[in-house]
Structure formats: structure tokens, C-alpha cells
Amino acid sequence: MMSLKIQPAVPKKSDKPSATNRDCQNFKREKNNLPFQLTDKSCNLDISIRQERKKTLIFSFFSGAGFLDLGFELSGFDIAFVNEVHPPFLEAYKYSRSRMDIPKPKYGYFKGSIDECLYAEKAKDLAGWVKKEKQNGIIVGFIGGPPCPDFSIAGKNKGKDGENGKLSQSYVDLICKNQPDFFVFENVKGLYRTAKHREFFNALKRQLSDFGYVCTEKLINAIEYGVPQDRERIILVGFLSQHVDALQKFDWDAHISFPDALEKDWPTTEEVGRVVSQPANIYPELTVQYWFNRNGVDTHPNASKHFQPRAGLEKFQTISEGDDKKKSYKRLHRWRYSPTAAYGNNEVHIHPYLPRRISAAEALAIQSLPKEFELPDNMTLSNMFKTIGNGVPFLAAKGIAMTLKSYLENHYERTKTDGC
């Protein structure tokens, strides 16, 4: 049996500003708008909490461990309410925020289903909070990504009639009932590209239009925002029509950093165990190795959290580096981006040059989370990888949030007494 002791090469620098440097520049610009104190050692910035009250509050649904929410928090939004039905995910949300010194949401955490927010006692609380904030002149936004296996190619594909598919309808019903000033709806590309699911998606948009929303949508790829991952998702954004200018001014591309990411001459496969130098003419900051280095995955608190192979090491030692075309076992390439971070349905992502599955720390890096983000040590491996795989990649979430922020600042009119 051969021994794999390959050490990663150090990434070469590219002429394009790194994701780290761009984040530093954005942090400097947003220094007074962030809702918590965070020290980013890579930037040497100390970002202090803003004292005055915000003009926008976010209510989060299907929150998971809060990847989407973190993108909004680091863009200057306040999270006011968090709803998640799965207890381990909600505990991970709370834990990660406590480790990053992020304040608790104004209206707290709610462990329960979206339907409880729509019909049960919690529905009264939610309606009252939204109404009160809007009457006080606060802009209220709903964000969420309903569970998507019923629309996914890899899922059971039951569509709107599946238990998960029904949650998309519930989320839209919740929006229509509570009338937030704007909303974000995130889902898999299957909802947008598959004909029978597209019909349901269009019906949801018609319902939103009937309740006063003007909407814009885009099939995004997370890699264009700096995420080391080829991950397409449909994003639907809507605004109450009486408050907004023409949506042609909503610039989806404003915070895209790598529009030509997939056009580069990326490496394909290498014999496992070889020392592989970084190729020229790629974006190093979109590679798996760059993010492993950036996040210090070997010393991260979740570094040891990975599944042990059931059949020993032999299979892991025969799959070529970069061979990610197989249905189940996919070995990442250190100098390429990852395929979609989906760790269910018997899909196994193998470390580029070590004979094991990737760790939770490495999966978080592939989802572009800040290195300060960590999951609780007592969380099961299954729950760790499920919440990581389900989450919206952080830099994509941040790019969408920044686009929304720019639009709200420049094209949104709000009066103090409306929204009653």
C-alpha cells in the first residue's frame, strides 16, 4: 500500500485582487455598518458595533446554521428573527454566532415549522412584530431558502407535492400574509430549469404579483462571487411595488467578481500522490487549496470532523486527483474549484491528496465561510455535513446582500406611516 505524504504547494499570487483583499476593502467601506465586533486577522481590522438603530431588519426562515444570514450580517443588515425546525441546526446557528460575538436577534429564535409561523400562535407574534417595525419606518425583509430535494436532480423529484416542495408554497404564503417590504427566495436550479417545476415557480411569482410584489430573478453561480465551488442556484427577489423604482435598476452583476471563472483552463486530473504545481492562467483564489490555506483547515476547531472510510483506504488511494465525474466518489483537485458541495445521496468528496473524506473544516472553507465560523463539537457528523451542504455559500450570500443594500439605498422610498 502506498503512502500519501504530499504537502500542498503554496499558491502563486494572481494579478487579480484576492478574495481576502476584496473583503478587506469591503470591510473598510462598511466598517460603521456592521452589526457586531469582528477581528479579521487577515485584514487587521477591528470592526465595531454600530450604535444607532438600523433602518432595515431581516426575518430569517429555514435558517439552518445561518450561512445566508451571515452574508446579510456582514453587509450591514440586522437579523431580527430566526426560524429553524431542526434543533441541531438551530443550536449550530446560536453557537457559531456566540463564537463570533454576534448579538442575538431582536425577536429571538424560534424552533418550529414554517407553518407554525403561518397559522399557529407564533403567527400572531410575527405579524405584530412586522407591523410594528413597518409603522416605525423600518424596512422589513424576509429571507429564506426552503428545503429543495423535491426540486433537485439528485433528490426524489416530487416537486410541489413533496413534503419539502410544499414548504416553498408556505414561504410564499407567509410573505403574502405579512407583507414585508422585500424578500429573498433561494432554491435549486431544478425549480427554474425543469419544465414541470418551472410551472410551479411561475405560479408562485403570479401569487406574489397579486399581493403587490414586483420581482426579479437570476440563476446565479456561486463561483462568480468568489466561492471555490461550481454551484448554481435560483434567486428570486421581490419588493412591494409602491416603494420601488423600475427593477431594471437592480444590478445583479454589481458584486460579481469572477464572471469568466468557468472559462479558465482549469486542470483536469492527476495521478494520485504526485506533487502538483499551481497552473498558470487560473484564479488561485477560486481553488480548493487557496481556501484550505486561507481558513487554516488543519488547525480549525472542526479539523478532525470527517467520516472514516468503511472499506479501508484502498479505494481512496486509486481515484485520481480531480476525478469528480463519478456519481458517488469524487476526488477534489487542489488547483481547481469544487463541484457542488452536496454531501448526501451517497456522494463522497475525497481530499485532493490525502486518503480520506474532506473534513467539516474543509467543507466550510469550500462554502467560503470566514475562518472564524465553526460548528459545535458535539454536533453529529451527519448533521454537520447536512447543514454545510444545504447552506448558501457565504460569499454568494454576501454578494446578494450587498446588491440588495445598494438598491434599497438608491431606489427605495419609505414613509414612516405606511405598512399598517
From Swiss-Prot:
Enzyme Commission number(s): 2.1.1.37
Keywords: DNA-binding, Methyltransferase, Restriction system, S-adenosyl-L-methionine, Transferase
GO biological processes: DNA restriction-modification system; methylation; negative regulation of gene expression via chromosomal CpG island methylation
InterPro entries: C5-Methyltransferase, C5_MeTfrase, SAM-dependent_MTases_sf
GO MF assignments: DNA (cytosine-5-)-methyltransferase activity; DNA binding
Residue numbers spanned by region Disordered: 1-23
Pfam families assigned: DNA_methylase
Catalytic activity: a 2'-deoxycytidine in DNA + S-adenosyl-L-methionine = a 5-methyl-2'-deoxycytidine in DNA + S-adenosyl-L-homocysteine + H(+)
Active site: 148
Domain SAM-dependent MTase C5-type: 56-411
Family to which this protein belongs: Belongs to the class I-like SAM-binding methyltransferase superfamily. C5-methyltransferase family.
Protein name: Type II methyltransferase M.NmeDI
Organism name: Neisseria meningitidis serogroup C
